[in-house]
Amino acid sequence: NIDYDVISDEDLHYEGLAAIEDYSVVVSSTHPEYHSVEMWDAMDAYQRRGGRLMYLGANGWYWRIQYHSEVPGVIEVRRNEDGIRTWEARTGEYYFSFSGEYGGLWRRNGRAPQKLLGVGFTAQGFDISSYYKRNPDSHKAKVKFIFDGIGRDEKIGDFGLIGNGAAGLELDRADRALGTPPDAYVVASSVEHTDIYLVVCEEMLVSTPGVGGHENELVRADITFHETQNGGAVWSTGSIAWAGSLAHNNYKNNVSRMTKNVLKRFINPKPF
């Protein structure tokens, strides 16, 4: 019984911070892949003023886009140089025709998603989903609220509508080198992905064996928590499939429990 409003990508682009500044908590969709600079800056400003973000997905804040200044609903994306993509911009077409700015991955624009979210795109696969195991960080005092009612050795999300697990389709991981805050807690990570799950191409300089889920430690989803300025915070699940596990057993499960734990705590203005 928590009141909510739905804000679209266009709302965030055209209204900026004003679209979300009055909310104590913003909850993302499961696959917020495309963001303009206006959208990115709005979320960054929201966090800096003490807003709290629950990122319930993966492959988010990935491609930089541009909206047409006169035609509503029209966006431009340039799939430059790198990243998982189904088509590629031709040489000389890396800049937006709408604005003249460079397109492509936000990571190549100096803004890896880890800087904003704690996690960023790392792997994808489309056979079955998996589950999470708790990490040592999960037992630290500041983040114990996340696991209220969840056992020390419970498998988190070994069920669900999307591949029978909460960690699946596309996965995000923490990486300090890419901007995950040094004080971020990596409280849980997914395990036992198949070799259908492969590391994304921007992580590789040359093609090599061992990029599948059975061998490569980059094939995982991380659940992270970090604080931002003025009492703000970010909690990220690292998986598109997370939402598919919420309704399992009439919402009586540890994925739903954890999500509710975080939402209730984020609504509470008390400092962490």
Language-model regions: role of each:
Residues 1-69, 246:
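Helical hinge/lid and interdomain linker segments adjacent to catalytic or ligand-binding clefts
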Residues 62-78, 126, 131-272:
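Extracellular ligand-binding/catalytic regions of CAZymes and related secreted enzymes
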Residues 45-105:
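Catalytic or ion-translocation cores adjacent to nucleophile or general acid/base/metal-coordination motifs
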Residues 81-156:
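Mid-to-C-terminal "cap/lid" subdomains and adjacent gly/pro-rich loops that border
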